[in-house]
Amino acid sequence: MSKITLSSLKSSLQQGLKNGKNKLNQAGTTLKNGLTQTGHSLQNGAKKLILYIPQGYDSGQGNGVQDLVKAANDLGIEVWREERSNLDIAKTSFDTTQKILGFTDRGIVLFAPQLDNLLKKNPKIGNTLGSASSISQNIGKANTVLGGIQSILGSVLSGVNLNELLQNKDPNQLELAKAGLELTNELVGNIASSVQTVDAFAEQISKLGSHLQNVKGLGGLSNKLQNLPDLGKASLGLDIISGLLSGASAGLILADKEASTEKKAAAGVEFANQIIGNVTKAVSSYILAQRVASGLSSTGPVAALIASTVALAVSPLSFLNVADKFKQADLIKSYSERFQKLGYDGDRLLADFHRETGTIDASVTTINTALAAISGGVGAASAGSLVGAPVALLVAGVTGLITTILEYSKQAMFEHVANKVHDRIVEWEKKHNKNYFEQGYDSRHLADLQDNMKFLINLNKELQAERVVAITQQRWDNQIGDLAAISRRTDKISSGKAYVDAFEEGQHQSYDSSVQLDNKNGIINISNTNRKTQSVLFRTPLLTPGEENRERIQEGKNSYITKLHIQRVDSWTVTDGDASSSVDFTNVVQRIAVKFDDAGNIIESKDTKIIANLGAGNDNVFVGSSTTVIDGGDGHDRVHYSRGEYGALVIDATAETEKGSYSVKRYVGDSKALHETIATHQTNVGNREEKIEYRREDDRFHTGYTVTDSLKSVEEIIGSQFNDIFKGSQFDDVFHGGNGVDTIDGNDGDDHLFGGAGDDVIDGGNGNNFLVGGTGNDIISGGKDNDIYVHKTGDGNDSITDSGGQDKLAFSDVNLKDLTFKKVDSSLEIINQKGEKVRIGNWFLEDDLASTVANYKATNDRKIEEIIGKGGERITSEQVDKLIKEGNNQISAEALSKVVNDYNTSKDRQNVSNSLAKLISSVGSFTSSSDFRNNLGTYVPSSIDVSNNIQLARAA
């Protein structure tokens, strides 16, 4: 089929009128006789619309006439068959039998074969409106078609008395009616044909738009349209319609890449005020001319009413909305330039799609806005008359038909552009043998590396690790999702992609094959390295392991959903080697949302386990939100619960038979935590709606759940910010209470117990224990063996109870001479310069009982044998007792200074005191409640050398 152009459309429409006039002239004498006979017939039935079915055209033969008949009955349109009605087609007078509409002796006839053939001949009309054989199956399309034509002819019949017209034989009025009928036929045929030539339509619009874009300023736009060839007074109605179609090109002005958003908005307003204004002038003049011909008023007030009504019908907001679409296209195009350099042109495809569909939308918006303005003018003109103006044929009915066809055509145009996107993607995938959307994620990751490279290459220094492994989950990308939806390839997209990058000595390893990351099977292997230290950092939340599959399903007529199916793996297995590694699992998504309440809170979730085999080396593991199984292997390994709100710990190792084995129970209470949820991405391509299910991490409020971790070969546990409970084993345990009010019981063994922040209760139990209360008012018990207590400024008021052994109390950051010693009741209070007290309970109880009870024998040693300052200086329990007694229950500053000076002059003890000073200093710098990290770091300061320092303390 030949392409439709603006000029050919005008020519065709003009020819329609010309044919009408020629036929009228050619009729000659026949016209006089025919019109007289027809006039008599029309007296009884001129105001009927008839669906005419000729003899032999049977609806049972597989055509769509049966559906048209049903629709006609629904709409009250009479149905006649030739053999029943004996209709006399006025072939000799009007020769309209090859058109959809025609005059007959009983009224206006809608020819069923011609309408049926039109639908068959135009398959794209058939696809949108419904084919001739299935038209009734799609929301009553036959009703829509017949109803639209009936509306047009209803306007004709209300504005023209055909009986009177034919009887009076007024050639001017007859020409007008005939022109209207011909125009309707031509418009239906030509616009229907344009659906098959979408590219031609767009091409002609684009050509005219390119001319307009070269005009300086916007003021010349109306002149350009005014310079179109004049079709003459008799065809002014055609000029209006042609102006509407050509005026659609003004939408391209809004797409000018050189124009600012403000200029585009101004272009919309300018177009509304000037271009449509000129069309309105033509409409108004035509309406007024017809009012004069009908003997109706054409005074100034009437003209003003028409003009004002037309103006109100024009909404610049329509053009502002179009401008926003072009703005979106411009933003995406600008965004796309970077990713094109990285091997992905999907964003450019998306920008082109929005620009092309925006142009289509702009054209339709322009036409519809102009039609609304004209219809408003017609309504104003008709308001003052009892009989509507004949221009209703050219406006009210025709505009409705144009609008309907354009709306149906717009979707076909959108899909045509979408098909081009689809073909480009398929072509690329065949050439590169790779998923196109995966390439999109790859480009996003490369851009992320470029943006953050300076930060990433500094991680070796910041994290004090020779090797840093950065694992990044590229999340769902809305623009990639839009592209998949537009191209109808939603089953080919994934929820994202995970990447591994390694950094050594401040250099990025472009592809580190030594790290294995297998998302489908849940494997992370970092064991293949010759570096001594490494840090594994999950930069963004890593989704749960498993393989995704998608299925695109049609939900409604124009609605599709792509369902997500996941073959899940219930755990990650992480393998480390000989390096001393720090691994933070708090950014690994371990909970999968299963059920929600009405407020969207998670009330049921599923667990994804982490199994970590750490191998040799001194490793640090930060535990995440759910079940974790850790085998520390060789070396001194620490497990941290200090990050995230993942529940208070309950550890009971009293029955453990293997050193370093612990069962850690956690109740993660009502709060927010990372969960994997299924979200839906929605994209509209005109009337087509696409929904895509995808996975994402969601920091969602949830109800509580219980987790049990299993630890093996773990030497040290750092608690949570909640109120933890620790019960040690028969072996040496190292516990850090972290924040919260913690209860820590070392049980047997030589334990290291750190209270952290909060008012903790610490009991060393049996063994030579190292006890640090931390900040808060702590209650500390050492037991009967040789214990070491540590206090520093800011730790608060601690209460210590001891019962035997050779014990030591170290003030890690205070000189001994700056402390105050007092006897309060039977206890000893030691006060620092900040006023914080360490109270040693019942220090003097045995002495007080001995002085008051005859023959009393001491049964328990409740004293601490040495109290040590930050420089290693110390005072013994015997010296404390003597000086307290001499100082009337308090040691004077002078007496305390003398003790310190005497100790410092002792040469044979200097080496030991220096070693002990290191012990105290290291303890002072070790803050168990700290997170030991910067915003992304995982560095944990080395804890004190437990065995060596205790030996030094004992030797001291």
Swiss-Prot record:
Transmembrane segments: 233-256, 266-323, 361-406
GO terms classed as biological process: killing of cells of another organism
Coiled coil (UniProt feature): none
Pfam family, any one: RTX_C
PROSITE patterns (alphabetical): HEMOLYSIN_CALCIUM (PS00330)
GO terms, molecular function: calcium ion binding; channel activity; toxin activity
InterPro entries reported in the protein's UniProt record: Hemolysn_Ca-bd, RTX_C, RTX_pore_form, RTX_toxin/Mannuronan_C5-epim, RTX_toxin_determinant-A, Serralysin-like_metalloprot_C
Hemolysin-type calcium-binding-type repeats, residues: 718-735, 736-753, 754-771, 772-789, 792-809
Function: One of the virulence factors of A.pleuropneumoniae, which shows a weak hemolytic activity and is moderately cytotoxic for alveolar macrophages and neutrophils.
Domain notes: The Gly-rich region is probably involved in binding calcium, which is required for target cell-binding or cytolytic activity.
Family in the record: Belongs to the RTX prokaryotic toxin (TC 1.C.11) family.
Protein's name according to its UniProt entry: RTX-II toxin determinant A
Native organism: Actinobacillus pleuropneumoniae (Haemophilus pleuropneumoniae)
Source organism phylogeny: Bacteria, Pseudomonadati, Pseudomonadota, Gammaproteobacteria, Pasteurellales
Gene giving rise to this polypeptide: apxIIA
